[in-house]
Swiss-Prot record:
Protein known as: Photosystem I P700 chlorophyll a apoprotein A2
Cofactor, free-text remark: P700 is a chlorophyll a/chlorophyll a' dimer, A0 is one or more chlorophyll a, A1 is one or both phylloquinones and FX is a shared 4Fe-4S iron-sulfur center.
Subcellular location as annotated: Plastid, Chloroplast thylakoid membrane
GO biological process, alphabetically ordered: photosynthesis
Annotated residues for binding of phylloquinone: 669
Organism: Cyanidioschyzon merolae (strain NIES-3377 / 10D) (Unicellular red alga)
Pfam families: PsaA_PsaB (PF00223)
Molecular functions per Gene Ontology: 4 iron, 4 sulfur cluster binding; chlorophyll binding; electron transfer activity; magnesium ion binding; oxidoreductase activity
Length: 732
């Protein structure tokens, strides 16, 4: 007899209801809970799955390269980057008639326009034709196959790493720091120096000639003689035409600062220098930890030395090394939190300091990339706290952590939670109070009575980095300060030009509207943090439910006996935090997008005047920018925004469907399911189809998850359609 799904749980496989399917899906990746799972097997499974994950990523990127080479217009785009729309791939659809062709593409084939920035990236790194794209696609396909094979190999008995290998922290740190970060940065520097920089100067370097083509006229002599400054001499001039030798220099590692005047992207030679510096730092860092040779740092010793003499941290970090080493959830929480911060930084730097040629002129791509990276950062940070909570429930050992920093954090959790609560309340009432006050006085025709606060501290910080507009005369905004004098011969002239150039996004001028929305965002951040921190710190137990850890991560309720313990599991904290996270990133992206739309349209006054009261946001940002979207198709025909209007509508539908699961209870669904099953069994033809599992309604937690997923997907897709269409409608 065939084994029923799920194979990893005998108890679930023998469940006679549809619960078997849903719980099977829910726990498929919870390896710890699977039948017969050992710690060693757990580590080996996760390790092997990493190779599969990488294989999927390489296959996906290979597909990007392949479809652009096959169906895109990369070579035409390279010839005229500012006037050509980059195509992602063709669309085959019998619904598209002549009218649609004309409306969507203004050409003769239906295609998806690429808003991901890959064209700009490939162009910047030296790719110039479709053959190179095909070569890259093939290379990644081979790499994908290699990683799949490696994943398979590492679950074979002979090649399974041992548990001690996984827990050898020093060795792992050395290899990851020096290998993953250091050597990959060095390799990327090599690519920039040998391929990308020559291509930006009109010299093609490919597989056929890269060994014979020195990237610098002096070759390696300056490197071996210690005369490294030669590599920074004769940089590209301000008149350099990107992709040609006109105005090109010979420098390969520079510190110019600012942007290339024509492409408005960071200087390639600056980026090569940056990656080389990172490579050196990380390769050195990758030799710091003690392994076989008895030299270098020992992590346990370092951690346990962190014990202030004042005694305020109790036993300090004693016990942390063992706790971290033995808890995958602790490690995953730290990794997710770090990755979240990095992803949010990418969102910020991608527009403020564009690294890719001409991307600063592609407003839709900039908007899409910012929104994309901020939402990913939000999802990752919520995941970090979720796994932090699971760590406290499953992996935390009070005996091992007596009076150390972790134990003390748990001991004074009330102080942490109440302070966060106070900050959230303060920010919420004051910010909303200002917005509502301004809204009322504007509505009654007295806009001059608004309370408008200049963000003088933030303006002062901008001035320290060289913004002259505010007249602060401090640090880099004062030509006589030590900071300015020290950097005058290096990167400062280029940087100052960039900071004070009103046409880019670096250090935008800020005023009262920015002050208010920054505090609204701060409210969202602090409230999300409050929910996540409370969920993690109360995961083991609280005054209401001291034995909470015995109920696991995602219990729904424990009945009315203890005063009603609904909505207090660590899972419920994650659930509530997700809504606040989405809300907060909504405000962040609204702010970013509206400020940039007004900047790009040369109408900064619109944002400055309308962003200080609520109706300004609703009317002059949301309504004004969604109206062309809603008119994407109408009785008079369609235009190039029709697809986005359909997506806008459909995503709203997905979002609204979420509420059906969020605002209804199990009994209702159980009755409905039983009625439907009764009708099905008595309907001719339909009753030929039978199922073995008895249909039961989703549990409370499952229904909430289904509702949350619909809410999240609908929310993000609605804004994706809005941000792309409202930007493309103005600048395409």
């Amino acid at each position: 007899m065939a084994t029923k799904f799920p194979k990893f749980s005998q108890a679930l496989a023998s469940d006679p209801t549809t619960r078997r399917i849903w719980y099977g899906i829910a726990t498929a990746h919870d390896f710890e809970s699977h039948d017969g799972m050992t710690e060693e097997n757990l580590y080996q499974k996760i390790f092997a799955s990493h190779f599969g994950h990488l294989a999927i990523i390489f296959l996906w990127t290979s597909g990007n390269l392949f479809h652009v080479a096959w169906q895109g217009n990369f070579e035409q785009w390279v010839a005229n980057p500012l006037k050509t729309k980059p195509l992602a791939h063709a669309i085959w659809d019998p619904h598209f008639g002549q009218a649609a062709l004309k409306a969507f593409t203004r050409g003769d084939t239906v295609a998806n326009i690429s808003y991901s920035g890959v064209y700009h990236w490939w162009y910047t790194i030296g790719i110039r034709n479709n053959v190179e794209l095909y070569t890259g696609a093939l290379g990644l396909l081979v790499l994908s196959a290699v990683f799949l094979l490696a994943g398979w190999l590492h679950i074979q008995p002979k090649f399974k790493p041992s548990l001690s290998w996984f827990k050898n922290n020093e060795s792992r740190l050395n290899h990851h720091l020096a290998g993953l970060f250091g050597v990959s940065s060095l390799a990327w520097t090599g690519h920039l120096v040998h391929v990308a920089i020559p291509a930006s100067r009109g010299q093609h370097v490919g597989w056929d000639n890269f060994i014979m083509t020195p990237p610098h006229p002096a070759g390696l002599q300056p490197f071996f003689t210690g005369n490294w400054s030669v590599y920074a001499q004769s940089p590209d001039s301000m008149q350099h035409v990107f992709g040609t030798s006109q105005g090109a220099g010979t420098a390969i590692l520079t510190f110019l600062g600012g942007f290339h005047p024509q492409t408005q992207s960071l200087w390639l030679t600056d980026m090569a220098h940056h990656h080389l510096a990172i490579a050196v730092i990380f390769i050195v860092a990758g030799h710091m930890y003690r392994t076989n040779f008895g030299i270098g740092h020992n992590l346990k010793t370092i951690l346990e030395a962190h014990r202030p003499p004042s005694g305020r941290l109790g036993k300090g970090h004693i016990g942390i090394y063992q706790t971290l080493t033995n808890s995958l959830h602790f490690q995953l929480g730290l990794a997710l939190a770090s990755l979240s911060v990095v992803t949010s930084l990418v969102a910020q730097h991608m527009y403020a300091m564009p690294p890719y040629a001409y991307m600063a002129f592609d407003y839709v791509t900039q908007s899409a990339l910012y929104t994309h990276h901020q939402y990913i950062a939000g999802l990752l940070i919520v995941g970090a706290f979720a796994h932090g909570a699971i760590f406290f429930i499953r992996d935390y050992d009070p005996e091992q952590n007596q009076d150390n920093v972790l134990a003390r954090m748990l001991a004074h959790k009330e102080a942490v939670i109440s302070h966060l609560s106070w900050v959230s309340l303060f920010l919420g009432f004051h910010t909303l109070g200002l917005y509502v006050h301004n809204d009322v006085v504007v509505a009654f025709g007295n806009p001059e009575k608004q309370i408008l606060i200049e963000p003088i501290f933030a303006q002062w910080i901008q001035a320290t980095s060289g913004k002259m507009l505010y007249g602060f005369q401090v640090l880099l905004s004062s030509s006589t300060s030590n900071a300015s004098v020290a950097a005058q011969q290096l990167w400062l002239p280029g940087w100052l030009e960039a900071v004070n150039n009103e046409s880019n996004s670096l250090f935008l001028t800020i005023g009262p509207g920015d002050f208010l929305v920054h505090h609204a965002i701060a409210l969202g951040l602090h409230t999300t943090t409050l929910i996540l921190v409370k969920g993690a710190l109360d995961a083991r137990g609280s005054k209401l439910m001291p034995d909470k850890k015995d109920f696991g991560y995602s219990f729904p309720c424990d009945g009315p006996g203890r005063g009603g313990t609904c909505d207090i599991s660590a899972w419920d904290a994650f659930y509530l935090a997700m809504f606040w996270m989405l809300n907060t990133i909504g405000w962040v992206t609204f702010y970013w997008h509206w400020k940039h739309l007004s900047l790009w349209q040369g109408n900064v006054a619109q944002f400055n005047e309308s962003s200080t009261y609520l109706m300004g946001w609703l009317r002059d940002y949301l309504w004004l920018n969604s109206s062309p979207l809603i008119n994407g198709y109408n009785p008079y025909g369609m235009n190039s925004l029709a697809v986005w209007s359909w997506m806008f509508l459909f995503a709203h539908l997905v979002w609204a469907t979420g509420f059906m699961f969020l605002i209804s209870w199990r009994g209702y669904w159980q009755e409905l399911i039983e009625t439907l099953a009764w009708a099905h069994e008595r309907t001719p033809l339909a009753n030929l189809i039978r199922w073995k599992d008895k249909p039961v309604a989703l549990s409370i937690v499952q229904a909430r998850l289904v509702g949350l997923v619909h809410f999240t997907v609908g929310y993000i897709l609605t804004y994706a359609a809005f941000v792309i269409a409202s930007t493309a409608g103005k600048f395409s």
